[in-house]
Amino acid sequence: MEKPVVLGTLGTVYGIKGWLKVNSFTDVAEAIFDYNPWLINQNGVWREIQVSSWKRHNKGLICKLDGIDVREDALALTNVEIGVAADLLPALPEGEFYWRDLIGCSVVTTKGYDLGKVTELMETGSNDVLVVEANVKDAFGAKERLIPFLEEQVIKNIDLTARTIEVDWDPGF
C-alpha cells in the first residue's frame, strides 16, 4: 500500500462514549470528513476505520468512529495520524500541485546548478516557501536554502515526471 496522505490527527478523548477530538490539517477543517473511510496509523501500522458521526464542538471538531464505543477504546487512538489513500484526493487543475508531490524533487537553477532536494514546504502568509536541502558538496557551503514559491518570478518549470523544479535563483543566496 502506498503511504497514505496525512490529513490530521486524532486528539484527546471527549466524553465516555468513545468520541475523540480531531486536529484537521485541511484548509477547511471540516473537509477532513469528506473522506471516509480514514486510514489511521497505530504503532506504525495503517488500518481502515469508518467515521460514523462528527460534529463541531466549541471551536474544534469531534468524531465517533465505528467500533469505538467506550472511553477506554478511544484512549488507544489519541494522537494517531489520520490519512487517506492518495487517489481519493481531488485532481488539481493544470499548473497546481500538492505539496507532497513536490517533496523530494531536485531543484535546479535556469543555468543548470543543482541546488539540492525539496525536504518540506512552509506557509508564510504571503507565499509558500520551498525548503531545499543542499547537496553535500555544495560549492557555496549552503546546508539549506529557502526559496519562495513564486510562479513565473522564481519557479520557472515543474516536471513531476522527472522530479525536477527549475528556478531562477542565485545559488549563493
Curated annotation (Swiss-Prot):
InterPro entries: PRC-brl_dom, PRC_barrel-like_sf, RimM, RimM_N, RimM_N_sf, Transl_B-barrel_sf. It is found in: Cytoplasm. Residues 94-173 form the PRC barrel domain. It comes from the Bacteria. Its main location: cytoplasm. Pfam families: PRC (PF05239), RimM (PF01782). Transmembrane segments: none annotated. Keywords: Chaperone, Cytoplasm, Ribosome biogenesis, rRNA processing. GO terms for cellular component: cytoplasm; ribosome. NCBIfam families: 16S_RimM. An accessory protein needed during the final step in the assembly of 30S ribosomal subunit, possibly for assembly of the head region. Essential for efficient processing of 16S rRNA. May be needed both before and after RbfA during the maturation of 16S rRNA. It has affinity for free ribosomal 30S subunits but not for 70S ribosomes. PANTHER family: RIBOSOME MATURATION FACTOR RIMM. The PRC barrel domain binds ribosomal protein uS19. This is Ribosome maturation factor RimM. It comes from Aeromonas hydrophila subsp. hydrophila (strain ATCC 7966 / DSM 30187 / BCRC 13018 / CCUG 14551 / JCM 1027 / KCTC 2358 / NCIMB 9240 / NCTC 8049). The lineage of its organism: Bacteria, Pseudomonadati, Pseudomonadota, Gammaproteobacteria, Aeromonadales. The gene is rimM.
